[in-house]
C-alpha cells in the first residue's frame, strides 16, 4: 500500500489547484511549510538530476530511503511523473523559483516517455506525461511542454481500437492478442487525449476518449456504482470475454484504488468532454466509495472493499478519491451536493493525512 505514498502527499497541494473550497485551502496553507520541508528532504536525498537515465522516487519503506524507478520500468515506471508533478504544484502554491527550477529539471527527462507505447501498460503514458508536462504547461504556458502533451495524445490515439471502442491497456499475458484489455485506471490516463483534442491535437481524439469512457461505463462500472478493474475483449470482434481484477481481492470485489481512479477520471472526463453521462457515473462511483467508508465507520478505505477481515488501508486511494470529490463538488449542480462532496473530501483527507503522518513518524520516512 506504500507504493503510491507519493500520490497521497502530492494530492494535498493538488487540492489547492483543483478546488475553490476555502476550508480546504486554509488547511493546506497552514500545512504548506511542513510539506515543503518534506519535499526538500526528498530532493536532498535524490541529489541533482543526472543527465541520462534519472531515477524517480516511487516508494518509501522501513529503511528510511526512497526506492526509485526508471521511467521505462514496467512495474513502477508509471509513477515517475508524480514527483515532478508534486514539484509543479509546490511552485503553484508558493511561486518560488526554486520549486519551479526543480520541477523543470525533473520534468524534462520524461519527454521521451510520450512515445513509449511498448510498455506493459502503454496507457501509463498518460500518468507520466499528464502529471509532469500537464502541470508544467498549465503553470508556464511554454509551448515546448504542450508539444510533449500532444505527442502523448498521439500515442494514446494510436492505441484506440474502433471495434472495441476503447484504448488498449495491458500487453502482458494473458492480455496479449487476440485479447484486448481495458482497465479502470485508464480513466485517469487519457488526459492528453481529452485535452489535446482542443489544444493542438487532432479533433478526432475527443471522440476516441468519449467512446472509451462509454465502454468503461458499460463494461467496468457495475449497477451499484462499484467497479471491475479489467474487462477483456476480443480485439477483432469487440466481444466482451471477461471482467475481473489483477490487483484486487477477487474478480467480484472492488479494488479501492481502482474505484478512486474511476471517481476522479469520470469527473475529469465530464469537465473536458461535457457528457452528462460521465457526471452521473462519477456521482454513482463516488456514492459507492463514500458509502463503503460510512458503512465501515471509517474515512480511510481498505485496499479492497470486499476483502475479508481486517485489511491494510490505502491512503493513496483515499487521496485520489478526496481530490476527485473536491472536483466533483465544483460541477455538482446544487449547493447541497457541493457541500456534501466537500465534507466527504475533508473527512477522507483529514483521516488520511493523520495516518500518513503517523506512518512518517513511525518509519522515519525518507521524506
What are these regions (language model features)?
Residues 1-18:
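Fungal secretory targeting signals
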Residues 20-367:
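Glycan-recognition and catalytic cores of secretory/periplasmic carbohydrate-active enzymes
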Amino acid at each position: 500500500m506504500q507504493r503510491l505514498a507519493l500520490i497521497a502527499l502530492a494530492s494535498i497541494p493538488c487540492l489547492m489547484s483543483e478546488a475553490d473550497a476555502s476550508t480546504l485551502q486554509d488547511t493546506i496553507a497552514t500545512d504548506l511549510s511542513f510539506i515543503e520541508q518534506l519535499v526538500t528532504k526528498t530532493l536532498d536525498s535524490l541529489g541533482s538530476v543526472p543527465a541520462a537515465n534519472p531515477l524517480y522516487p516511487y516508494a518509501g519503506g522501513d529503511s528510511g530511503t526512497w526506492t526509485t524507478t526508471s521511467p521505462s520500468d514496467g512495474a513502477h515506471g508509471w509513477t515517475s511523473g508524480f514527483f515532478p508533478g508534486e514539484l509543479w504544484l509546490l511552485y503553484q502554491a508558493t511561486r518560488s523559483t526554486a520549486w519551479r527550477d526543480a520541477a523543470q529539471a525533473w520534468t524534462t527527462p520524461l519527454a521521451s516517455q510520450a512515445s513509449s507505447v511498448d510498455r506493459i501498460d502503454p496507457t501509463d503514458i498518460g500518468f507520466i506525461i499528464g502529471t509532469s508536462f500537464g502541470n508544467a504547461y498549465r503553470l508556464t504556458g511554454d509551448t515546448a511542454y504542450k508539444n510533449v502533451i500532444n505527442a502523448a495524445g498521439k500515442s494514446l490515439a494510436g492505441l484506440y481500437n474502433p471495434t472495441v471502442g476503447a484504448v488498449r491497456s495491458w500487453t502482458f499475458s494473458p492480455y496479449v492478442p487476440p485479447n484486448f484489455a481495458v482497465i479502470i485506471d485508464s480513466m485517469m490516463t487519457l488526459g492528453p487525449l481529452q485535452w489535446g483534442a482542443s489544444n493542438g491535437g487532432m479533433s478526432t481524439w475527443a471522440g476516441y476518449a468519449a467512446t472509451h469512457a462509454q465502454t468503461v461505463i458499460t463494461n467496468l462500472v457495475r449497477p451499484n456504482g462499484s467497479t471491475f478493474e479489467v474487462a477483456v475483449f476480443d480485439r477483432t470482434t469487440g466481444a466482451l470475454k471477461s471482467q475481473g481484477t489483477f490487483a484486487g481481492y477477487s474478480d467480484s470485489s472492488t479494488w479501492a484504488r481502482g474505484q478512486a481512479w474511476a471517481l476522479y477520471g469520470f469527473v475529469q472526463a465530464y469537465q473536458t468532454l461535457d457528457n452528462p453521462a460521465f457526471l452521473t457515473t462519477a456521482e454513482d462511483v463516488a456514492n459507492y466509495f463514500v458509502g463503503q467508508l460510512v458503512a465501515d465507520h471509517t474515512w480511510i478505505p481498505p485496499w479492497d472493499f470486499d476483502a475479508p477481515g481486517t485489511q491494510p488501508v490505502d491512503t493513496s486511494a483515499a487521496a485520489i478519491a478526496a481530490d476527485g470529490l473536491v472536483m466533483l463538488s465544483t460541477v455538482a449542480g446544487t449547493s447541497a451536493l457541493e457541500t456534501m462532496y466537500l465534507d466527504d473530501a475533508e473527512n477522507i483527507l483529514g483521516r488520511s493525512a493523520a495516518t500518513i503522518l503517523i506512518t512518517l513518524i513511525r518509519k522515519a520516512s525518507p521524506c
